[in-house]
Amino acid sequence: MTTPLAVIADLVPPGSRVLDLGCGDGRLLAHLRDTRGCTGLGVEIDADKLIAAVQKGVDVLQLDLEQGLSMFADDSFDVVLQIDTLPNIRHTENALRETARVGRLGILSFANFAHWSIRLRLLTGRLPVTPELPYEWYNTPNLRIATYADFTRLAAHCGLRVVQAFGLRGGRRIDFAAGLLGSEAVFCVQRA
């Protein structure tokens, strides 16, 4: 388990029912099951990642998140995770509202485009390539970029309350000036 994922896993209450949107290879759900006694369901569109998750004993549905989460009732889960998923979704507001509808707590993370090193790279006239944003501008899977401050505004716009927010840098939690010093942003949100 990578350190950033371990920090995020610590935010999930033991024994929670967890939905992981864009679960990838199922590593986080398997960790939550094995160390925190959580039950979980992953959603993944990529067939190879889905197979890797199933091989870890994780239950996974192959769904396109752009279609919404209408198959789940309100409050079906204690926690809904979107780890590095939101920048890859076209209908961001709907995805965020659906996260809050089907779960009591939403935990989201994404690369923070306002990190100081990215700001510095932009001064050279080029888009950055970093561990958190490892692609050139022309081949990135990200549909959009986000900042810590922008997400705070989006959450309010969607009628959500931010209950906890911080940055991550090198697996370390950053609480002071998280928008400037955190290369990744982490938010816990609930319906207001």
Predicted feature residues:
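Conserved alpha-helix/loop element of class I SAM-dependent methyltransferases that forms part
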Residues: 1-15
